[in-house]
């Protein structure tokens, strides 16, 4: 099975845009028992790509992409487990062609498209320049390293220049195919600038794209790519890339991760082997005494999750996370579920950013898993405004 998976990943690296997904199918998976959930998640190591993790606990129907080589085997496994299934997408290649038209933003930055990295940088520079003479707000575009392909790793720092406030960090684009997280982060920039009360008690660090190389690759080559583009492994030129959110130094390479460079869950050669994870680590080291809240924006389907992910237990801040998370869910309209990360989907995940930061002293850390994957252009603003309402209520709770 591993050999087949390696071959398929090699093929993915050489085909034209979208063509590598010909014959791939996406299944809706409806789980009824905890045993089904436990066993189903173990299939990820065999090349099944979960677009949305199923949750028996919350009645969340999962979406799993299956290559043609795995289809019979996968369906046999589902039958063995008694999992209800239906074909959601018959051919991923055709699906991507049909949905591509609304992916790219036009010449203006209006939250009605998904923008390329260079345009995002230009937009951030424009905002920085617009406020360079302001006396009541300080906006800095800070570069802190470069990717393997030479792109700058940047963040926005927004604050009141006369104060030394606590810090909120918003991180997006750690999984490069989760495009909706990027406008969600940039929307936070706009909201904080417009609503200055959020600068009374906080400096805001906003990273719109943690993984620029992977993000660009999803635009130009493989839409469903999940890693960066590093070639440090022994198969780097054949199977490049590391899953950034498996590369942090907490329970590294143990759960929901892989030692195979050709896996979409590959955790790297060692913790912090990648410039993107070192970038976040350096931010933590710089602001560690001031970080009040850390939020990782992801896109696996309508959850707010808090530590731990690496073990089936809560952190010492369980009660505080639950109370604040409940307020966030309510502010977002009640459409999101709230739980400990490892319990929400019945599986653990090693090497994640929020677990690492919690282990190293950050009191409040959440994943906001934005609802819906392929949000159409006309719906982007509605979706990201809902995310902002959750972030805003969390920040306001500390200002009271």
Where are each of the predicted segments found?
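M14 metallocarboxypeptidase catalytic domain recognition
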Residues: 2, 13-400
